[in-house]
Amino acid sequence: MHVLVVHNRYASAQPSGENKVVDQEVALLREAGHRVGLFERRSDDIAGRSLPGKAAVALLVPWNPAVRAELAARLRAERPDVVHVHNVFPLLSPAVLAACADAGVPAVATLHNYTQVCPPGTLQRDGRPCTECVGAVPLPAVRHGCYRGSRPATVPLAVSLAVNRRRWWSGVERFFCISAAQRDVLVRAGMPAGRLAVKHNFVPDPDVRRSGDGEQLLFLGRLAEAKGVRLLMAAWDELAAGGGVGVPLVIAGAGPLEGEVTAWAAGRDDVRYVGLYNAAECRRAVARSVAVVAPSTWLEAFGLVVVEAMAAGVPAVAAGHGAFAELVEDGVTGLLHRPGEAASLASCLRRITADPALGRELGRAARRRYEQGFSPAVGLERLVDGYRTAIAGRSAQARGGESRVGRGDGDSR
């Protein structure tokens, strides 16, 4: 099969689960003998642009005509069987869907977050769940400055969502939802249920697994409010006030709360902030852990770090909402705490560190869960099945003499 992957890579200065998923899927497909091409833009390149060039980026977020022309020309030249769209913000735009329609190539799209119904994609505002923009014109997001706390920065995203919603919903043959929890939200928002398929992200089998009880608790991810970083700090201070749990907390990552985390960890024996790990360091750190901590306050659409822990035979202590409640079976493959409650998180951390036998049992069950649902073999099967469904759907339309463009769902700009 010939696949063209379309992705706007996130900035390399901060960890990106999406970049990792894209790279892993491309490698998996190639190893299985499929031909895979890439059509990419990199957010890192924005920094090197002139001031007018940087200002122009926001104007092209809703629609980039140059990208449409470039991608359509490549599709006509290479004739892939299917296009797999990931992130299109900020340099690609939904114009990639028009390019697919122009060239008559079916498109599938992985929905890594909630940007189809929420401009910043988090379904969260001020640390609490928010669905004001779901199924509506996203004016509340602009009013509250939901993207990076800025109204001007939110406007391009809100405009893109409003003007391109129909284009997304009609121009993609198959949407890959990365959890059933995410799919439920999107169906309630009005997205076409028949084209929303659950396809969990897979994780490569790590080269190192936990062999003992673990020597630390690990937070691995973006240092941001939505990831529960402040909640974790509050829970850890509560534990420290009671004498601690006997193992240190290791925090690895980067993000807007980095300065706050650095100051909080300074001079403490029970906390280590280690900065941004590379991939190999991440795997080794996970394998040394009693548990991986994932206390997100927003409704995670998936939770890659939880599955990476499962692969290493390490349980997770995670917030009991969103995809985490789907990935982690409480008391079987890990522990779930009440979302947003520091005391509940502290209780779970205390429990898993106080009972090594429980930790070992949860870790073994987590590894079995990984093998059954998140291995590369399972991931490849689901990915290729999704492609075949999309190709068959487009072929059926062609045989029936009907296409989305012919029904007026395409774009003529």
Can you say where each PLM-predicted feature lies in the sequence?
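Membrane-proximal helix-turn-helix segments that form the acceptor-binding/catalytic region
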Residues: 102, 130-174, 184
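Short hydrophobic beta-strand element within catalytic cores of glycosyltransferases
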Residues: 315-318, 328
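Nucleotide-activated donor-binding/catalytic signature segment of Leloir-type glycosyltransferases, i.e.
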Residues: 259-280
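A conserved mid-protein helix/loop that constitutes part of the nucleotide-sugar donor-binding site
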Residues: 20, 215, 219-238, 256-260, ...
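Acidic donor-binding loop of glycosyltransferase active sites
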Residues: 287-301, 314
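Conserved acidic donor-binding segment of nucleotide-sugar-dependent glycosyltransferases
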Residues: 330-331, 335-342, 351-356
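Carbohydrate-associated surface elements
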Residues: 181, 202
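A short, well-ordered alpha-helix in the C-terminal region of glycosyltransferases
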Residues: 344, 351, 358-373, 379-385
